[in-house]
Curated annotation (Swiss-Prot):
Its cofactor is pyridoxal 5'-phosphate. One of its GO terms (molecular function) is cysteine desulfurase activity. This is Probable cysteine desulfurase. Catalyzes the removal of elemental sulfur and selenium atoms from L-cysteine, L-cystine, L-selenocysteine, and L-selenocystine to produce L-alanine. The active site is at C363 (cysteine persulfide intermediate). Belongs to the class-V pyridoxal-phosphate-dependent aminotransferase family. Csd subfamily. GO terms for biological process: cysteine metabolic process. The keyword Metal-binding does not apply. It comes from Chlamydia pneumoniae. CDD domains: SufS_like (cd06453). The gene is csd. Its EC number is 2.8.1.7. The modification N6-(pyridoxal phosphate)lysine is found at K223. It catalyses: (sulfur carrier)-H + L-cysteine = (sulfur carrier)-SH + L-alanine.
Length: 406
């Protein structure tokens, strides 16, 4: 089988400089394949124009290419219509858009939004800030040691009157995969709405928002091999039509009236101003690349590698893996602590040998509190990784532990 590293120029560039480079931080951001880099460069060098605003040919051509990406995203998440796809600046921006708009429309003063007790900051601070301004409340759903939502606690909080639930698809700390279809059924039984932070789900798992019946799903381009500064908010069409816009500007209003403006329908009413055209085109190129591999191939490869990594780590004394057991569903990442070794020290020693991992609280201090740890060493995989990367990581990790424990 082809070595997928060949599609990502950074690996050849590092090799040319004789610089070791094993990238195990794809949960933070992914490396970019050549066709994504080419798509962005070609837009700026040979086809640059604005979109949705002009009748000249170069603008029409770019507008057509831009619209085609919305359809590619629709297919990637299995949405019913491309009008359910809103382009944002990323997962964080999408969650903040939702938090503000949802509070404006559906959450009364004193109302309740639910998040889990182990969230990334993007899916807790966004809601806390918006709810504080609204006068509504954020309450926390308990999670089990595996990281799974406690469905009994969720039902208790829904029964008490919560109006909205926002949870991660895959934890960026533990890799735990939430049973979205089961959660959605429970949430809708109590006439509430469900949003999903899909930052760690969309790049690694087959996505089917219709099958799961989630109301909203949010993710970032840069974690799915596309450019930074662009993201996606999926929302059911009837719900997006109800929600008010949170930003004003060009290309989102049909008729301006200073007392009662008539906004364009979704998704345009949520995309004020000149968009990140290069980012959207780069995202389209990333999805083309992934479609050439297939979501099933990506999932199968990454699950096999993650399981292999998990088994190897279990052989190292003192390693404590957070979240799911080796038999339970897990995304393409593992967070761990190691007795007698601080994650920051290990991260430094690994970097000296050309191995990139994430250390610290992972922008998820609530999760650190839930598992009673201060810092975590996280290994996260991408489609370019292979068993050789894992073998080298394990070798250097053991060597680093020997140095620290002397």
């Amino acid at each position: 089988m082809k070595n997928l590293k060949e599609d990502f120029p950074i690996f050849a560039a590092k090799a040319k400089e004789n610089e070791p480079f094993i990238y195990l931080d794809s949960a933070a951001t992914t490396q970019k394949p050549q066709q994504v880099i080419d798509a962005v460069a070609n837009f700026y060098t040979s086809s640059y124009a604005t979109v949705n605003r002009a009748i000249y040919s170069s603008s029409r051509n770019v507008t057509e290419a831009y619209a085609a990406v919305r359809e590619k995203v629709r297919k990637w998440v299995s949405a019913a219509s491309d009008s359910e796809i809103v382009f944002t600046r990323g997962t964080t921006a999408g969650l903040n858009l939702l938090a503000i708009s949802v509070n404006d429309l559906w959450i009364p003063k004193g109302g309740v939004v639910l998040v889990s007790e182990a969230e990334h900051h993007a899916n807790v601070l966004s809601w806390e800030i918006a709810c504080r301004r609204r006068g509504s409340l954020v309450k926390k759903i308990r999670v089990h040691d595996s990281g799974l939502i406690d469905l009994d606690d969720l039902e208790k909080l829904l029964n008490e009157g919560a109006q909205f639930v926002s949870i991660p698809h895959v934890s960026n700390v533990t890799g735990c995969v939430q049973p979205l279809q089961q959660v959605a059924e429970l949430v809708h039984r109590y006439d509430a709405y469900l949003a999903v932070d899909g930052a760690q789900g969309a790049p690694h798992l087959p996505i089917d928002v219709q099958l799961w019946d989630v109301d909203f799903y949010v993710f970032s381009s840069h974690k799915i091999y596309g450019p930074t500064g662009i993201g996606v908010l999926y929302g059911k069409k009837d719900l997006l039509d109800q929600l008010p816009p949170v930003e004003g500007g060009g290309d989102m209003v049909a008729i301006y009236d200073h007392q009662n403006p008539e906004y364009l329908p979704a998704p345009m009413k949520f995309e004020a101003g000149t968009p990140n055209i290069a980012g959207v085109l780069g995202l389209g190129a990333a999805l083309d690349y992934l479609d050439g591999l297939s979501a099933k191939f990506i999932y199968d490869k990454e699950i096999a590698l993650t399981t292999y990594l998990h088994k190897e780590l279990l052989e190292i004394p003192g390693v404590e893996i957070l979240g799911p057991s080796i038999e339970e569903p897990r995304g393409a990442l593992i967070g761990m602590t190691i007795d007698g070794a601080h994650p920051l020290d290990l991260g430094f020693l690994l970097d000296l040998r050309g191995i990139a991992v994430r250390t610290g609280h992972q922008c998820a201090q609530p999760a650190m509190e839930r598992w009673n740890v201060g810092h975590v060493l996280r290994v996260s995989l991408g489609i370019y990784n292979d068993e050789d990367d894992i073998d080298q990581f394990i070798l250097v990790l053991q060597d680093s532990l020997d140095k620290i424990r002397r």
